[in-house]
Amino acid sequence: MRRNYILYIIRYTFTIAFAMTLTACNEWLELMPDDSTIEEEFWQNGNQVESVVRACYRYMQEDNVMQRIILWGELRSDEVQNGSAISVSETDIVNANVKSNNTYCNWASFYTVINYCNNVLEKAPGVRQLDANFDEATFKAYMAEAYTLRALCYFYLLRTFRDVPLVLESSKSDDYDYNVSNRDTAAWVAYYQLPVSAASFTSQQYPLVDQEHYVVDKMIDDLKTAVEYAAKEWNDEENYGRITRRAAEALLADFYLWRASINQQLAPQQSTTDYRNCMAMCDAVLAETSEMEDAELVTGANLLRQVFYDGNSTESIFELNFTTSGHQNGGTSTLYGNTQKSRNPHLLAAVSLQMLFNQNKAGNDDADYDYRSKDFFNPRDNHIFKYEGQTPPSDFGSRNATYTYRGSSSQANWIFYRLADIYLMKAEALAQIASTAAEIEDVVTLCNKTYIRACTSSDEVKDQLDPNVYASTSDVQTLVLTERQRELMFEGKRWFDLLRLARRNGDVTTSWQYIESRYDDDVTTIRNKMSSIAAWYLPIYNNEMKINGNLRQNEYYESQDD
């Protein structure tokens, strides 16, 4: 029986990771010759379940995962330009010359994390029956971590490749067939309980049933369970580095926002419901945050230092903790560069970013008092400072002063969700359904949460986005997209924001207007290549296509490798 290449890698790395994880816990798992022996002797108590949960986080810290998280969300966006160390593979993606043999089309590392999660979800219930000390609350918390991390991995895969195989079982043995389809009609019929057979299914009859919706809907179901099961908080050291209820709610809000956008053209009423679902999840996060001691937005003056240099700040919800694990964050240091680590950047901040801080319709020059305009990147040489930076110039008048990077042994956490993102997700959802002047003003108020805190003075009349000049739904929709870029630049979100906009509109015209500034040459050629929404996704890796006959290539790339 043919075996999928990616899942051969999964099984191998899973066994090795077990050994590494347990060694750290002063235990040792002897590498047995077959999977059944390992399963029989390993899954005996709650501590062993936790060790595999921790392996999920640990593998997400690998460069193969981290660099894709950043590149998939930033490389083609309008907020970066090519740096001196950019690779040929990265340049090909930027220039819309991507082929299916491009290394960044390899999704294996994400399915490795998914496999760890699948093992937890399969085996933890049995361990609960074996170990009397493995209490129900702890068991559910571990399950919530696995559900949420698996959903997070699928969220990146969905937004990068669109149609991806949904693997919900762990690799068990050489005899297990993992040639899973990414157009699994039989699975759709079963999941949605459709009154048709797989053979008679047609997309014309069920326009909201396809692989993308199937994976999105399943992950939303899982995240609802995760919200119910998740720990409200861990101890202080782990409260931001492990999945909590707030983290599950934040990811669920993001999924609702995505589903609302992909449904907007075909099912506007369902789309409206999901925008409201997104807002409800954001409200849940904010309500729980209000009950926590010292959980709040960091001041603008401390934003770079506390949120991105120190990490685990008062506005954090979930971040991968490199600072406590001792593992190197090869994503930010390699791609954004760091002089203290002798790393030249693959990516620089786009020159056009300075214009973001000159768009306050009240007539103020935002760049003169918005901390983000000098702390997130160096406006002199366009080096990205967020994450790898330690100390920016102390005031706006000294922008030619030295930017000090974190030292060679200092590692940046990677932030998936923080309070700023919650306010802006809620703002985006509300902007899509706002029908009254009061609701439109509420969108501006939400954007002002991040805008006002980033300004230097306490004069909120001056340092605010004026609701009087954002009078229409179109105005506030554009405002949200702009404020998300000002606040969340270089956090792996911008490309997905623009793709979400394209899916919402049903075409790429408006989204292309943002990224057109990314190109100096061959603009017409690249625009033509990017004219289809399918071209905004990446092709499935060629090795996967060769080994798994059940995979179908993204339609845009079916003839690209000929």
Model-derived regions: residue spans:
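C-terminal motif of bacterial Sec signal peptides marking the signal peptidase cleavage site
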Residues: T23-A24
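Short, surface-exposed recognition loops and adjoining beta-strand edges that mediate ligand/DNA contacts
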Residues: E40, M66-S87, V167-S170, Y176-D177, ...
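Elongated scaffold/linker segments in the mid-to-C-terminal portions of large proteins
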Residues: Q44-N47, V53, Y57, N64, ...
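Conserved, well-structured interaction surfaces
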Residues: G46, E50-R54, R58-M60, I86-R162, ...
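Short coil/turn linking the two alpha-helices of tandem helical-hairpin repeats
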Residues: L158-T160, P165, W234, W258-P268, ...
